Amino acid sequence: MSNFKNIIPKRTYLERGQAKHRLHLGELEKKVDYGKRREIYKKKKKIENVLKEKIMTKNPDEFHTGMVHSRVTEDNVLVREEKVLKKEVQLKNKRQELKEQTNDLYNKLKKINKRLSNYQMNIPLRYVFNNSHELYNENEIYTLKAENKKLKKRGDLIQKKYNGLINMKKNLLDQIRKLDNKYITTYHKVDGYNIVTDKGKTPYRLYQPRLK
């Protein structure tokens, strides 16, 4: 008989909603929220019990390999010793860092040179920057000025961008000159600059890309 009772569809009872005058007390917790909170609490409790057991069964004279390269200070702070690398490995790492720095700087310089050449090739700078053009006749000189305000604004913007690119180029060249270049040599001059090694040092040959 009980099996037949379960077949008959019954009304599904919804959970009670929260009244508006009690919203200031916070959201009403539903059964799903309680289940999630219960699972999280049980997980934390398990971890806590495992850690408690470890502390209770810990041997004070226990040794592990991490103690060789680390120590605990009076303030109970763990201090680890730095790894001592061979000179060959240190030189290799230094060369790799310098190689990455120089490549990055030269790539940036190449992009700036390309943009500058585009400005010079595609835009007649003397017309746009000065906003004037001189016409020579047999006896007289005429100056034609751009009266259009939009053209003047455009010319000023292009001039600012052009000057900014030149300043960026100067800064990049200064950064390249300031690099610690004891172990790097370049065989291509870039804008009249070439890296030279110190005497007696073993150079690391780094071939840089050709630039204008």
Curated annotation (Swiss-Prot):
A Pfam family recorded for this sequence: Utp11
Location(s), subcellular: Nucleus, Nucleolus
Gene Ontology BP term (one): rRNA processing
Key words of the record: Nucleus, rRNA processing
Similarity annotation: Belongs to the UTP11 family.
Subunit structure: Component of the ribosomal small subunit (SSU) processome.
Function: Involved in nucleolar processing of pre-18S ribosomal RNA.
Name of the protein in question: Probable U3 small nucleolar RNA-associated protein 11
Organism in which the protein naturally occurs: Plasmodium falciparum (isolate 3D7)
Origin organism lineage: Eukaryota, Sar, Alveolata, Apicomplexa, Aconoidasida
Chain's gene name: UTP11
